[in-house]
């Protein structure tokens, strides 16, 4: 399973939403993510990918779409 597929599955598991057709849609505006959901997502991403998401790098505008989340995780995996 690749990073993209894993992240889409995590989002679906946590929020009961299939976002595969809305990769560039703002997940906050769409009602998929909120502040508590963001914390849950970060914890799960850190656990599954063995990464640390620094609070200083987690801005809503930087992680508000599925594509941005995927890019952020890939970047942290190669840091």
Curated annotation (Swiss-Prot):
GO terms for molecular function: D-alanyl carrier activity. It is found in: Cytoplasm. 4'-phosphopantetheine is transferred from CoA to a specific serine of apo-DCP. Its main location: cytoplasm. One of its GO terms (biological process) is lipoteichoic acid biosynthetic process. HAMAP family: DltC. Belongs to the DltC family. GO terms for cellular component: cytoplasm. Carrier protein involved in the D-alanylation of lipoteichoic acid (LTA). The loading of thioester-linked D-alanine onto DltC is catalyzed by D-alanine--D-alanyl carrier protein ligase DltA. The DltC-carried D-alanyl group is further transferred to cell membrane phosphatidylglycerol (PG) by forming an ester bond, probably catalyzed by DltD. D-alanylation of LTA plays an important role in modulating the properties of the cell wall in Gram-positive bacteria, influencing the net charge of the cell wall. The lineage of its organism: Bacteria, Bacillati, Bacillota, Bacilli, Lactobacillales. The modification O-(pantetheine 4'-phosphoryl)serine is found at residue 35. It comes from the Bacteria. The gene is dltC. Keywords: Cell wall biogenesis/degradation, Cytoplasm, Phosphopantetheine, Phosphoprotein. InterPro entries: ACP-like_sf, DltC, PP-bd_ACP. Residues 1-77 form the Carrier domain. This is D-alanyl carrier protein. Pathway: Cell wall biogenesis; lipoteichoic acid biosynthesis. The keyword DNA damage does not apply.
